[in-house]
Design a protein with these regions (language model features):
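Chalcogenol-based redox active-site neighborhoods
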Residues: 1-160
Length: 160
């Protein structure tokens, strides 16, 4: 069950990133403070749709998002920071940042999840994108369990 909605404050949760090769924590309050952020969730780094379509779409349109006043774009998944770092850095031209929801804090705080146990992945963050302005949720583009339409870079650009 989805626990967040437009005009809510984004939940203050802890993510992981690699800093000098070591996992470090970062809180959403640090990321979203006084910034316009697009947070894109994918079920898993290195998975086909995420790697071949979702992330490349945002890389391609990154400058267009900047022109619309977006400060940063973050991709998040229920992976560890080592996997997320390797995935994002496998795209040499990427200016996209990443967050690892290894402890599933975002999943639990938002309810935006998908059960991929049959595919060997377990319960993961679902595919979605959220536009956050200074910590306030302005729009949620939830794929509601599958597909890639609402949370695509092209759709977000049209709806900002």
């Amino acid at each position: 069950m989805v626990k967040i909605k437009v005009d809510d404050c984004f939940p203050d949760v802890t993510f992981f990133q690699l800093v000098d090769g070591n996992p470090k924590t970062i809180r959403t309050s640090d990321i979203f403070n006084e910034k316009k952020i697009i947070l894109v969730s994918v079920p898993g780094a290195f998975t086909p749709t995420c790697s071949n379509e979702h992330l490349p779409g945002y890389i391609k349109l990154f400058d267009e998002f900047k022109k619309k006043g977006i400060d940063d774009i973050y991709f998040v998944a229920s992976n560890d920071p080592f996997v997320m770092d390797a995935w994002i850095n496998s795209y040499s031209e990427s200016q996209i940042k990443y967050l690892a929801d290894s402890k599933l804090e975002l999943l639990n705080a938002t309810g935006l999840e998908i059960d991929l146990t049959v595919a060997g992945l377990g319960t993961r963050l679902s595919r979605f994108a959220i536009f956050v302005d200074n910590g306030l949720i302005k729009n949620i583009f939830d794929e509601e369990g599958g597909g890639l339409a609402k949370s695509s870079a092209e759709n977000l650009l049209k709806n900002l």
